[in-house]
Structures are given as structure tokens and as C-alpha cells.
């Protein structure tokens, strides 16, 4: 396996170091290449993501990312120049966000005994919607200013995400929920709903449901156990995945995969939390989400048994840690010891 590592900014290098520690335990011999991308490189060279680096990244099997963002860089510069560019250049049309409440982890929800287990995954479209930069503004700064952000949805883009979601549902509990707002967003909503129905005919064993996005947020709080696989567009997915993380114990336990399902490009895996510059360098950042990202990476590369080993070790750690606050390295050491 050839792995590109982008530790990034803030706590990124600290949590990635622990994720790599776990990877070395379960999958020795990985060929690793570190890339200095983020605020430090931007300040030193003015570069964000050179074309030459993109070409090098394409030669790897996967990418492990820490975190990007620093208050010394204007907002949006690194996010658009690095993260969004990677998303479009490497065709990350699927953003995968598991949502599971692990034993021993507290949820802010008042869950009743006997409620269904919270264990779902959100398959979010990653390259379309209103994030394509298709829009503009006129008469800026005047009382007559007009601004638009056009949401782009293509049959090609929707179909490939929906098919991936059905495939995941077949490997899980065989239930898929489309989340959209087709009573108001009638054109895009119709495309999504017709596509789900059409492709769903190829998966008769998968039970299909639909929820408006506002109803889905209610049910994610009142009855999250109803969900198995959720498929949705870029914007709605961006919103409900953060709610899902909160329901499952916080964004510090949320891992994600940015996936090119065609496997033409290396997919990228990362913890969802930000760079947290206020605690960077103190050795107190929780690396659990970064370690969970390694599990997603391994599963994507077909190493399911190895990924399951990491999952079980993380589950065991979370079940026993209680209110204990461990240093970053200590978390990695404890999970590594369990392996």
C-alpha cells in the first residue's frame, strides 16, 4: 500500500501521528509519503496545492488527512484552494460519514432503554449542489444587490451516488432513506427521487424511505435508530452529518471518507474535527476520530478484517475510558495495546 499523508495544520500532525501508529500495528510495511500542505507552506512559499503535488497524490492508493485551517490565513483560502480543489480534482463524489453511538459514549439525547441502536451511515454527494461555484453577484454593496448560488444536480452525478448508497445498504440492514426537500426544490428533488426509485428496482431487498430534510433532523434527534443508510445531496449532507456527529457523542469521534467510487483516484480519509489551533502542541487532542479514519481507509481498500480489528479496539477503548482524559499519545498507545 502506498499512502500519502497530509498532516496539515493545528492538531492535525498530532492526531495523524497516532493514526499512523495504529496503521503500522495492523498493516506493517505501508509505504508512506508525507506532504507539507496547509498554512505553513502557504506562508513560506505562497503555494496552496501545486499541480505537481496533485500529480504525485494520484500515484498513491489512499490519502490520510489531519486537519486544514489556521487563523493566520484568511478564511476560505485554504478551504477552497486545498480541500475543495482536492475534492474536484480527485473526483470525490461521495462523502461517507458513519454515525454510530459506541457503548460507553454519552449522547446528548435522552435515550430510552430498549431504543434501537444508533448505527447509520450518510452517503453525501460531494461534487455538485451549490458548492460548484456556479453563481455570482451584481450591484454589490448597494441596496439593489443580487446574489445567486446555483445548485447543480446532474443525472450522472446523482446516479453514481445513489447506486453506491444502495450497495452499502445491501451490506448493512437493507434500508435506505433519501433525504431532500422535493416539495420545494421540485426540479432537483424530482431528479433525486426518480433516480432512487429507478435504481431501487435493481435492489428489491432494500426498503426505501423518503424524508424531507427538516423532518430528518427531527427524527435524527427523536428516533435516530430508524436510520440505516441515508443518501442526500451536498448541502443537506453537510448539515445533517454534523447533527449526526453530535447525536453520536460529538464531532471529536467523527471520521469521514472522501471517495472516488470508480477508484481512478486515491480516496482521502480524515477526522471531521477542525485544526483546533487553540490546543495545538499541547498533546491533549483526542486522536480517536483520526484512528477511526484509518478503519474507513482499510475497509475502502478491501482490508475488511483489518478494519474490523481497528473498530473493535476503538470500541473497547471507548467502552472503558469513562470520564478519563488521556493525552493524545496515551490514547494511541492504549488502542495500539488492545491490538
From Swiss-Prot:
GO molecular function: 3-isopropylmalate dehydrogenase activity; magnesium ion binding; NAD binding
Annotated pathway: Amino-acid biosynthesis; L-leucine biosynthesis; L-leucine from 3-methyl-2-oxobutanoate: step 3/4
Matches recorded under Pfam families: Iso_dh
Predominant location category: cytoplasm
Highest taxon of the lineage: Bacteria
Binding site for NAD(+): 274-286
Keyword annotations from UniProtKB, A to Z: Amino-acid biosynthesis, Branched-chain amino acid biosynthesis, Cytoplasm, Leucine biosynthesis, Magnesium, Manganese, Metal-binding, NAD, Oxidoreductase
EC number: 1.1.1.85
Chain residues that bind Mg(2+): 214, 238, 242
Catalytic activity: (2R,3S)-3-isopropylmalate + NAD(+) = 4-methyl-2-oxopentanoate + CO2 + NADH
Binding site for substrate: 87, 97, 124, 214
Compartments where located: Cytoplasm
Keyword NAD annotated: yes
Keyword field contains rRNA processing: no
Role: Catalyzes the oxidation of 3-carboxy-2-hydroxy-4-methylpentanoate (3-isopropylmalate) to 3-carboxy-4-methyl-2-oxopentanoate. The product decarboxylates to 4-methyl-2 oxopentanoate.
Family that this chain belongs to: Belongs to the isocitrate and isopropylmalate dehydrogenases family. LeuB type 2 subfamily.
Official protein name in the record: 3-isopropylmalate dehydrogenase
Protein's organism: Mycobacterium ulcerans (strain Agy99)
